[in-house]
Amino acid sequence: MLELRSCSNLVNSSRRLVPLVTYSGLSAITLPKSRFYSQPSALEVQGTSDSRSDNILDELKQRGLVSQVSQPESFLRTKLNGNDKIKLYCGVDPTAQSLHLGNLVPLMVLLHFYVKGHDIVTVIGGATGKVGDPSGRKTERDVMENDIRQSNVASISQQLQRFFKNGLEYYRNRCALTEDVPSGKYTPRNNFNWWKDIKMLDFLADFGRHIRVQSMLARDSISSRLQTKNGLGFNEFTYQVLQAYDFYHLYKEENVTIQVGGNDQWGNITAGIDLINRIQPIKNKGLPFGITVPLLTTATGEKFGKSAGNAVFIDPSINTAYDVYQFFYNTLDADVPKFLKIFTFLNSSEIKKIVETHIKSPSLRYGQTLLAKEVTDMLYGVGSGSDSEALSNIIFGRYDGTLSAAKLVDLCKKARILQYADREIDLIKLICKLVNCSVSEARRKLSQGSVYLHHSKSKVNENISNLAPFLIDDRVLILRIGKQKCFIIEMR
């Protein structure tokens, strides 16, 4: 199952303004190489398919979305080349309130299949979440209260449905497709719905004989924990059995033949394949397969999806479209080509042109801007990227005066950054209110020329008792203090 991260300590840190920093040009960077992703030079962006008819497995590999495929891979390729419709799934345990950006990589695999006519299933671990997956962990998880788990299940269900709905809309818009072009079918599932009726003795009698303890002990997630001081609880030891049965159940009841997960899920996925092959006659259904995605890291070696030590979440109640836009806008130059391949449906020729344009003037952040707009559109709906770009331009001093006050208020409310003030307030008091400083400190900021009003390039050096001339449509004031603080205020 996908690992989620705690949503605590996020809101304040993720919304702060991130100052622009200067990165070296792409032409001077040697991008990281691995067997998952290879980039000999910034200009050699190759491999993403320009055709919907090309083998989807090859395209996913070329985009850096595939790490391992269970054997025989040739059989899977034959099915895909024959235009057979397949059904695949990915599981998520409700260990946090929201999915984070790092969870998107396996979900992008499902999305690629989905938009090209294949059926997909997501399984939320309402049952397995009670047990806890030891994969990739050195210690056992803390026990979660049942009501919190149920709340997480409900939240994640909405996030998954929103992701595939918006993702399909984004794909159709990006590829200029009409709605009559068929996609696959999306089916959400909760494994509690089948586990609640299974009795332990019946399960052991029917399935225990097909599960080999020697294979369980040999898996990395188990063997590594057995070497630690605290060892491994029986609950976590049996987790792979539960996930294996999930795959078997979906294979038998819903004709699901592929499970997708992170690299740390390889042992759990192959456990399911082993169980299916031992129980279910292969002649009745297609072979079961597993596909894993690589752990995505940045050019600096950090886990992708982190911002100042906190994960960036896709739940709009936690992180807004503007938050996600800013996260991708601050992508390192070296990561732009890779992230364009993984998180967008841009084809190879489009990505190559973007990179070439970016190299000419890296300081303009052309590549980051397009990346941020594409991902924001995919996650929050088409148009969210352009809105976030417009808001970013205002906040970072690039406002051209074309947006109405009503549009500004709407954008800022969605980003949850709109401030309010009495229209009779003078500038000194307004500065004190916004930055929580003394009157003398506010006067000092004015005298130093650190204060700007509206989108004027001229500095304000003295107190202003009447701010009406600086309002947009007699309603909104833009106040900048220094290089990193910008406030958009609705005057009432």
UniProtKB/Swiss-Prot annotation:
It catalyses: tRNA(Tyr) + L-tyrosine + ATP = L-tyrosyl-tRNA(Tyr) + AMP + diphosphate + H(+). A motif ('KMSKS' region) lies at residues 303-307. A motif ('HIGH' region) lies at residues 94-103. The keyword RNA-binding does not apply. GO terms for biological process: mitochondrial tyrosyl-tRNA aminoacylation; tRNA aminoacylation. Present with 996 molecules/cell in log phase SD medium. GO terms for molecular function: ATP binding; RNA binding; tyrosine-tRNA ligase activity. CDD domains: TyrRS_core. Gene3D superfamilies: HUPs, RNA-binding S4 domain, Tyrosyl-Transfer RNA Synthetase. Keywords: Aminoacyl-tRNA synthetase, ATP-binding, Ligase, Mitochondrion, Nucleotide-binding, Protein biosynthesis, Transit peptide. L-tyrosine binds at residues 89, 133, 239, 243, 246, 265. Its EC number is 6.1.1.1. PANTHER family: TYROSINE--TRNA LIGASE, MITOCHONDRIAL (PTHR11766:SF0), TYROSYL-TRNA SYNTHETASE (PTHR11766). ATP binds at residues 93, 306. It is found in: Mitochondrion matrix. It comes from Saccharomyces cerevisiae (strain ATCC 204508 / S288c). SUPFAM superfamilies: Alpha-L RNA-binding motif, Nucleotidylyl transferase. Belongs to the class-I aminoacyl-tRNA synthetase family. Homodimer. The lineage of its organism: Eukaryota, Fungi, Dikarya, Ascomycota, Saccharomycotina. GO terms for cellular component: cytosol; mitochondrial matrix; mitochondrion. This is Tyrosine--tRNA ligase, mitochondrial. Catalyzes the attachment of tyrosine to tRNA(Tyr) in a two-step reaction: tyrosine is first activated by ATP to form Tyr-AMP and then transferred to the acceptor end of tRNA(Tyr). The keyword Thylakoid does not apply.
